[in-house]
């Protein structure tokens, strides 16, 4: 899975083959096929592994933080960092590559991640930190902003600029949701 992630990061998904992954890992292609039947299965395994890793990191980051606006800041920061370090194709591209069963398996895992954001947003509304609104719509706006921000943070010339971009993104999303501090 590490080799797949490295190869995906450097080459992107279009045209990526099991041979490329095996070569990067320094093993024969047959060894990869012993674990994964095809590229779709490998992609799902990688995505599930990365999502689980991210969920654990997110849970640890949120531990002890009670204010939902502060939780949202942690969520945004970790998402930007995660999106910058792993390049999974967006949902529609993955759907076209995967069988309906594989896509559904991935969807269950992604749903767990979406529920973390939904919980944060629900708490922010319940505690009057943001105005009442549709949670799904708010989550889509948050994720849309995150997707466009991840590339900017990744391309920052230095750590200070990157940190400023992340803080600006956090504040932009919080203010866009109508946050009261």
Name what the model sees in each region.
Residues 61, 90-97, 149-156:
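Secondary-structure edge/capping motif, primarily at the C-terminal ends of alpha-helices
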Residues 43-47, 51, 103-114, 139:
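Amphipathic, non-transmembrane alpha-helical scaffold segments
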Residues 45, 49, 56-85, 138-142:
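Hydrophobic alpha-helical connector segments
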Residues 3, 7-41, 45:
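Helix-turn-helix
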Residues 77-116:
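Short secondary-structure transition hinges
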Residues 1-4, 21, 46-50, 54, ...:
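Generic hydrophobic, amphipathic alpha-helix propensity
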Residues 74, 115-127, 144-181:
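C-terminal peripheral helix-coil segments that are non-catalytic and often amphipathic
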Residues 131, 135-139:
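Membrane-interface starts of transmembrane alpha-helices
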């Amino acid at each position: 899975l590490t080799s797949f992630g490295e190869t995906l990061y450097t080459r992107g998904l279009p045209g990526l083959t099991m041979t490329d992954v095996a070569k990067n890992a320094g093993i024969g292609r047959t060894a990869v096929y012993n674990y994964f039947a095809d590229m779709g299965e490998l992609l799902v395994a990688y995505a599930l592994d990365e999502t689980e890793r991210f969920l654990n990191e997110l849970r640890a980051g949120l531990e002890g933080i009670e204010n939902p606006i502060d939780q949202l800041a942690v969520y945004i920061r970790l998402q930007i960092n995660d999106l910058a370090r792993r390049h999974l194709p967006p949902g529609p591209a993955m759907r076209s590559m995967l069988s309906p069963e594989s896509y559904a398996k991935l969807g269950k895992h992604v749903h767990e991640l979406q529920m973390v954001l939904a919980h944060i947003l629900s708490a922010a509304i319940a505690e009057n930190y943001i105005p009442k609104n549709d949670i799904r719509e708010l989550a889509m706006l948050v994720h849309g902003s995150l997707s466009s921000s991840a590339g900017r943070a990744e391309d920052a010339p230095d750590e200070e600029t990157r940190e400023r971009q992340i803080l600006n993104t956090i504040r932009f999303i919080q203010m866009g949701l109508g946050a009261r501090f």
